[in-house]
């Protein structure tokens, strides 16, 4: 289990990037969702040993990785936003180099192990090609192979799908879902669909604070029955925004098609109730600062499983990951 307690990071200025993060993450896929500048990358860099916190503790399976960072390196896989590749090396040579740095030993040799990693991410055909000749999707897959080097206990994946086209994203989801067996995979993203497809549990972060710890089904249930959609003239949109929580508004043929959150049960004339999406719940939470209470929810700091039988959501539902058992 990964545990953080009272994690704070203050940059010169002062700028508080993290403000008391308490979180327990169990084996399986766990998401950290929030807007740009929320503190996600700072959090990930601290976990990866690339940044020292101002205060707080981080433990992996009971061991304090801030006190003994050397104990983390062999057990860590890290897929950062910006890949750390040597462009002149081949994909195979890049992996061999990383395996050597990690002190990995393999009966068949490191080249064979590197080949096995490339095969796992469908890059065997490009094993001898220089990394500078890889496409964006190929670089993403090589990054996964790097993260898997040494069979790590903890894999940190920071903003993995930014810039990927839909086909590459679906392929990436499938690859990432395979990593979650018997290890902790921590995914940070600002894309709601990423957590909807991959994460049985996730936390929502804003301005360095955790606003909620939830699951896709819990988040949707928190606003169920309170989302409405309708059209309004362009000139009436400011009045609607003043009176209701408008989460989305799209201009269509001279009128605004608006989506609103209205717990009063008395929506404006012409608005009809619509099914709730995870994006709806996320947008409402970002406005309210908390999820509306709809019964018992898991306490902050716990990252257990989603409710049994929770429906898959999003256009990539076929790639959804079952909670780790």
Describe the predicted segments one by one.
Residues 2-4, 9-206, 212:
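ABC transporter nucleotide-binding domains
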């Amino acid at each position: 289990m990964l545990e953080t307690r009272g994690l704070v990071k203050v940059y010169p200025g002062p700028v508080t990037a993290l403000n008391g993060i308490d979180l327990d993450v169990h084996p399986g896929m766990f998401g950290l969702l929030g807007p740009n500048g929320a503190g996600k990358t700072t959090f990930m860099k601290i976990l990866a040993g690339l940044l020292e916190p101002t205060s707080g503790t981080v433990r992996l399976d009971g061991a304090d990785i801030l006190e003994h960072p050397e104990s983390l390196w062999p057990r860590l896989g890290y897929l950062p936003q910006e890949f750390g590749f040597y462009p002149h090396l081949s994909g195979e040579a890049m992996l061999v180099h990383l395996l050597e740095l990690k002190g990995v030993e393999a009966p068949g040799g490191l080249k064979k192990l590197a080949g096995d990693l490339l095969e796992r991410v469908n890059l065997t055909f490009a094993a001898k090609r220089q990394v500078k000749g890889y496409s964006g999707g190929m670089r993403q897959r090589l990054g996964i192979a790097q993260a898997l080097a040494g069979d790590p206990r903890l894999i940190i994946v920071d903003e993995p799908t930014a810039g990927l086209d839909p086909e590459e994203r679906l392929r990436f989801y499938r690859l990432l879902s395979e990593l979650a067996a018997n290890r902790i995979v921590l995914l940070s993203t600002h894309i709601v669909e990423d957590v909807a497809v991959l994460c049985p549990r996730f936390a929502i972060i804003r301005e360095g604070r955790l606003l909620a710890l939830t699951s896709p089904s819990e988040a949707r249930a928190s606003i169920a029955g309170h989302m409405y959609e309708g059209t309004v003239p362009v000139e009436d949109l400011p009045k609607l925004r003043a009176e209701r929580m408008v989460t989305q508004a799209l201009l269509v043929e001279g009128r605004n098609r608006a989506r609103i959150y209205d717990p009063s049960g008395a929506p404006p004339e012409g608005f009809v109730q619509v099914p709730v999406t995870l994006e709806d719940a996320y947008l409402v939470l970002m406005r309210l600062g908390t999820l509306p209470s709809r019964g018992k929810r898991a306490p902050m700091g716990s990252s257990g499983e989603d409710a049994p039988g929770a429906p898959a959501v999003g256009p990539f539902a076929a790639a959804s990951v079952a909670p780790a058992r």
